[in-house]
From Swiss-Prot:
Native organism: Francisella tularensis subsp. tularensis (strain WY96-3418)
Any Gene Ontology CC annotation: plasma membrane
Molecular function (Gene Ontology), one example: ADP binding
Phylogenetic classification of the source organism: Bacteria, Pseudomonadati, Pseudomonadota, Gammaproteobacteria, Thiotrichales
CDD domains per record: ATP-synt_F1_alpha_C, ATP-synt_F1_alpha_N, F1-ATPase_alpha_CD
Family, as annotated: Belongs to the ATPase alpha/beta chains family.
UniProt key word Transport: yes
Protein name: ATP synthase subunit alpha
UniProt gene name: atpA
Residue sites binding ATP per the record: 169-176
HAMAP family hit by this protein: ATP_synth_alpha_bact
Cellular compartment(s): Cell inner membrane
InterPro entries assigned to the protein according to its UniProt record, in alphabetical order: ATP_synth_asu-like_sf, ATP_synth_asu_C, ATP_synth_asu_C_sf, ATP_synth_F1_a_nt-bd_dom, ATP_synth_F1_asu, ATPase_a/bsu_AS, ATPase_F1/V1/A1_a/bsu_N, ATPase_F1/V1/A1_a/bsu_N_sf
Site entry (Required for activity), positions: 373
Amino acid sequence: MQLSPSEISGLIKQRIEKFDNSVELKSEGTIVSVADGIVTIYGLNDVAAGEMIKLPGDVYGLALNLNTDSVGAVVLGDYEHIKEGDKAYCIGRILEVPVGEALLGRVVDALGNPIDGKGEVATDLTSPIEKIAPGVIWRKSVDQALQTGIKSIDSMVPIGRGQRELIIGDRQIGKTAIAVDTIINQKGTGVKCIYVAIGQKASTIANIVRQLEEHGAMEHTIIVAATASDSAALQYIAPYAGCSMGEYFRDRGQDALIVYDDLTKQAWAYRQISLLLRRPPGREAYPGDVFYLHSRLLERAARVNEEYVEKFTNGEVKGKTGSLTALPIIETQAGDISAFVPTNVISITDGQIFLETDLFNSGLRPAINPGNSVSRVGGAAQTKIIKKLGGGIRLALAQYRELEAFSQFASDLDEATRAQLNRGQRVTELLKQKQFSTLSVALMALSLYAADNGYLDNLEVSEVIPFESALHALAETKYSDVIAEINETGKYDADIADKLKIIVEDCKANQAW
């Protein structure tokens, strides 16, 4: 087939018109070393701190060390196929994770990929894992209670929405149990929960998922899991990923609760990464910025005002405040709260719940030490009725602890001292609470009223818990209207006091326990 000169010139013209002469700029580097999940890349001149780097085999790295002629990055995934001489590329994006309502009820890894076998997460929304915390002018004071349903916490160490309350103690003494109970107690309150598991066994995480499902709490919970078998890089970024998922709710005028279980393991992972990146070690071999590691994370938990929510949602949500409450967990070694990481986190948070091994072993569970535990801002948020009735409990316990030590050396005690010791023993017994048995505000108030007004003083210590169970059962069946009223209003006045008195005296008269 012969083409005429005009046809040939037409084809050439078409080709010239279709020719794409645009230049795609791509920052390319060469991997000069790879070991222990760390890659060193030469030639990436335009990379930013915290930027994602594309590595061979659809794996990404996170740029952490920016040197004069090289970049040190941690690999977010499998690195065994990466070798010296491979190419690496900047992609111009900071690490992001999926966020949104679709994550509720799911178990995801530190990058937001589902690991629960329930298919893909149906959300297109993403958020950077690192964000600047809201400034002072966007914050609102903490004045709404976050009920844990645990008597000793809600009465003595109250937590408010938007607070950071540290749970600290040795291993295996119930730190996670307190956090899980708090998540379960948010059922029906509208508070969304995020549980971040860092460096835990996969079987432990599976057990927590099962417990939450059994108590109907997975519907309002996201679980972010960086297991013990995951790399140090994933354990390091998991808390930030979980925090971004919680901020989605906070910034839209909702309330969220996030549990970091536990930040000690995150600090260990960060120490490992820093040492592999040849950063100079400091105290306990931690890098110099380990305080900033936790402060920039925990400062993102806040209560934000109406203006912040309205500005963030472009006017779609008006007149609503949002909050993100953080419950970081720190594991101590032999009760040493003066170690580096515990003291750092104590200084960052708004209070701490201190658990003691001796109390746990003596049968007091939750094993909370009321002397060392404090809530710096929760008092303003505490429910009025619990605040009124719980004040006497803390005083009774403090006096009891003081007298208990003294009474070991004294043979004969006066009547007043003996009465204080008796009440202290019964209050201590009353504060025992099994896991998964959280209480409503009204039932908690009923127990505190009975203790505060001396109704437990003439009971044997062994009768306190059975009496409390009978009291709650009676209140829920015969006096359900009073319980509903207290749960709804949370107020305490002479009328409510009279109603509580009638319930307690009715129970004592029946002796149904």
